[in-house]
């Protein structure tokens, strides 16, 4: 009958959202012979032209999902964000004093506060839009449908197909839904409930201004070494981070400023901004920082930084519906790892969907039960780590914005944060994804065994 899941049929999954995590997941599921349909609400793929960086670990996860993803990343102009020099090919994260002038005779001089070795190609940076453009080419065009804003999901029973209704009135039937629709996720609102504070993001009281700057201009502003390597300039109530992108032809620069006020509209996270406001926030900072600020456009967007920390999602799954990436655990960007954690999600889900296919094709368990067990497994494996990131990203921004940076008598106190920052960074960089895969397979297998036992006992009773 129409709408009923037939045993042995290939699993059909709808991915809601065409951001980086949604597209990476689509590539991974296609590789595992899962029938995928990807629905994006905008007319095209929505990433802006700002920079993004991936850890070496996240890139290895991409390789596990499908090597074509790494090929797309490299073809989009990704470069190591922070190699020191020819003698030392490793990447480093650097925190420098962005506020105080330490040498009157050399305005370019800034005191190095801390440096962490991220290893060879520890971070690779690129433009978001260029990576996504290269990534989309990996997916068959018939998989993607744009201008599809999700309105509702109708659940009619575990062994019945889900009915997706879009704002344009069209409907689609699928076996499962994975919401990768970002921080303002409609899928999250559906499974957690309208009006539930956990369904919506909340303001972190930080705003961001970002731009791309030609490398030659960046060198004039910062000096060659700082321009060609990642640096994070910290100071009271603000910080500025930059790193090279586009084959080192540009730098991606983002300024974050603390804001004690409430954001006026939590449905609209972007507002018109101006360089004059940035200049006020960074008045009195080091000449290098002010030089970079002067290279931002006079008129530009001001991005409110929202996240899901105040009211974390209590679960990522409901039946045959699941959340991944920012839809599940949108964090502030201060670890630079939100997308990396989303890539880990995609690897976990691709692993699970492969097992679901095996279970269904072998007729061990029904498709509905297999999918539900898979999403329960995903929730168990991924929620704790991903929620930790949301918390930790808030924590490290507090380090960067300490008022103590402005008081020389309290510099030693302020600098005690860096050992903790190193530990937090290592937790992200040195994640054992092989162990995650093993735990995922074991957890799913245990759930499947419990379902088989339950089915066997039910047959005996009959």
Swiss-Prot record:
<feature type="glycosylation site" description="N-linked (GlcNAc...) asparagine">
    <location>
        <position position="391"/>
    </location>
</feature>
<keyword id="KW-0812">Transmembrane</keyword>
<comment type="similarity">
    <text>Belongs to the paxM FAD-dependent monooxygenase family.</text>
</comment>
<feature type="glycosylation site" description="N-linked (GlcNAc...) asparagine">
    <location>
        <position position="252"/>
    </location>
</feature>
<feature type="binding site">
    <location>
        <position position="40"/>
    </location>
    <ligand>
        <name>FAD</name>
    </ligand>
</feature>
<dbReference type="InterPro" id="IPR036188">
    <property type="entry name" value="FAD/NAD-bd_sf"/>
</dbReference>
<dbReference type="GO" id="GO:0043935">
    <property type="term" value="P:sexual sporulation resulting in formation of a cellular spore"/>
</dbReference>
<feature type="binding site">
    <location>
        <position position="53"/>
    </location>
    <ligand>
        <name>FAD</name>
    </ligand>
</feature>
<feature type="glycosylation site" description="N-linked (GlcNAc...) asparagine">
    <location>
        <position position="357"/>
    </location>
</feature>
<protein>
    <recommendedName>
        <fullName>FAD-dependent monooxygenase dbaH</fullName>
        <ecNumber>1.-.-.-</ecNumber>
    </recommendedName>
</protein>
<feature type="active site">
    <location>
        <position position="210"/>
    </location>
</feature>
<feature type="transmembrane region" description="Helical">
    <location>
        <begin position="10"/>
        <end position="30"/>
    </location>
</feature>
<dbReference type="GO" id="GO:0046148">
    <property type="term" value="P:pigment biosynthetic process"/>
</dbReference>
<keyword id="KW-1133">Transmembrane helix</keyword>
<dbReference type="InterPro" id="IPR051104">
    <property type="entry name" value="FAD_monoxygenase"/>
</dbReference>
<comment type="function">
    <text>FAD-dependent monooxygenase; part of the gene cluster that mediates the biosynthesis of the antibiotic 2,4-dihydroxy-3-methyl-6-(2-oxopropyl)benzaldehyde (DHMBA) and its derivatives. The direct non-reducing polyketide synthase dbaI product is 2,4-dihydroxy-3-methyl-6-(2-oxopropyl)benzaldehyde (DHMBA), produced by condensation of one acetyl-CoA starter unit with 4 malonyl-CoA units and one methylation step. The FAD-dependent monooxygenase dbaH is responsible for the synthesis of yellow pigments derived from the oxidation of DHMBA. The roles of dbaB, C, E and F have still to be determined.</text>
</comment>
<feature type="binding site">
    <location>
        <position position="339"/>
    </location>
    <ligand>
        <name>FAD</name>
    </ligand>
</feature>
<dbReference type="GO" id="GO:0044550">
    <property type="term" value="P:secondary metabolite biosynthetic process"/>
</dbReference>
<feature type="binding site">
    <location>
        <position position="326"/>
    </location>
    <ligand>
        <name>FAD</name>
    </ligand>
</feature>
<feature type="active site">
    <location>
        <position position="243"/>
    </location>
</feature>
<keyword id="KW-0472">Membrane</keyword>
<dbReference type="GO" id="GO:0004497">
    <property type="term" value="F:monooxygenase activity"/>
</dbReference>
<keyword id="KW-0503">Monooxygenase</keyword>
<keyword id="KW-0325">Glycoprotein</keyword>
<dbReference type="GO" id="GO:0071949">
    <property type="term" value="F:FAD binding"/>
</dbReference>
<keyword id="KW-0274">FAD</keyword>
<dbReference type="InterPro" id="IPR002938">
    <property type="entry name" value="FAD-bd"/>
</dbReference>
<feature type="binding site">
    <location>
        <position position="128"/>
    </location>
    <ligand>
        <name>FAD</name>
    </ligand>
</feature>
<keyword id="KW-0560">Oxidoreductase</keyword>
<dbReference type="Pfam" id="PF01494">
    <property type="entry name" value="FAD_binding_3"/>
</dbReference>
<keyword id="KW-0285">Flavoprotein</keyword>
<dbReference type="GO" id="GO:0016020">
    <property type="term" value="C:membrane"/>
</dbReference>
<comment type="pathway">
    <text>Secondary metabolite biosynthesis.</text>
</comment>
């Amino acid at each position: 009958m129409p709408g009923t899941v037939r045993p042995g049929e290939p699993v059909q999954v709808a991915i809601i959202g065409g951001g980086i995590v949604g597209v990476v997941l689509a590539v991974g599921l296609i590789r595992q012979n899962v029938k995928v349909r990807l629905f994006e609400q905008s007319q095209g793929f929505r990433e802006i032209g700002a920079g993004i960086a991936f850890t070496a670990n996240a890139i290895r996860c991409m390789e596990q999902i499908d090597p074509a993803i790494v090929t797309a990343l490299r073809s989009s102009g990704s470069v190591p964000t922070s190699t020191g020099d020819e003698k030392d090919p490793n990447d480093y994260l650097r925190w420098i004093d962005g506020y105080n002038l330490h040498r009157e005779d050399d305005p370019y001089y800034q005191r190095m506060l801390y440096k962490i070795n991220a290893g060879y190609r520890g971070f690779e940076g690129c433009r978001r839009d260029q990576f996504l453009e290269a990534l989309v080419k990996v997916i068959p065009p018939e998989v993607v449908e744009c201008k599809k804003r999700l309105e509702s999901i109708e659940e009619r029973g575990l062994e019945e197909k889900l009915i997706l209704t879009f704002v344009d009135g069209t409907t689609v039937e699928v076996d499962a839904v994975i919401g990768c629709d970002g921080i303002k996720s409609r899928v999250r609102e559906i499974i957690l409930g309208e009006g539930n504070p956990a369904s919506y993001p909340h303001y972190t009281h930080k705003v961001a201004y970002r731009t791309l700057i030609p490398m030659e201009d960046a060198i004039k502003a910062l000096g060659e070494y700082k321009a060609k390597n990642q640096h994070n300039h910290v100071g009271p109530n603000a910080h500025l981070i930059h790193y090279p992108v586009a084959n080192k032809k540009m730098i991606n620069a983002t300024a974050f400023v603390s804001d004690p006020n409430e954001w006026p509209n939590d449905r609209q996270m972007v507002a018109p901004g101006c360089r004059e406001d940035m200049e006020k926030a960074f008045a009195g900072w080091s000449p290098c920082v002010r030089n970079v600020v002067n290279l931002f456009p006079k008129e530009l967007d001001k991005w409110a930084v929202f996240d899901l920390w105040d009211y974390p999602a209590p679960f990522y799954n409901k039946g045959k519906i699941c959340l991944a990436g920012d839809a599940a655990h949108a964090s502030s960007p201060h670890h630079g790892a939100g997308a990396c954690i989303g890539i880990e999600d995609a690897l976990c889900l691709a692993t699970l969907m492969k097992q679901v296919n095996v279970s269904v094709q072998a007729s061990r368990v029904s498709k509905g039960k297999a999918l539900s067990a898979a999403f329960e497994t995903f929730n168990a494996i991924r929620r704790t780590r991903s929620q930790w990131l949301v918390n930790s990203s808030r924590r490290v921004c507090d380090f960067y914005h300490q008022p103590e940076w402005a008081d020389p008598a309290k510099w030693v106190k302020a600098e005690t944060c860096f050992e903790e920052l190193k530990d937090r960074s290592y937790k992200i960089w040195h994640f054992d994804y092989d162990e995650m895969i093993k735990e995922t397979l074991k957890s799913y297998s245990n759930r499947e065994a419990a379902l088989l036992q339950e089915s066997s006992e039910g047959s005996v009773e009959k």
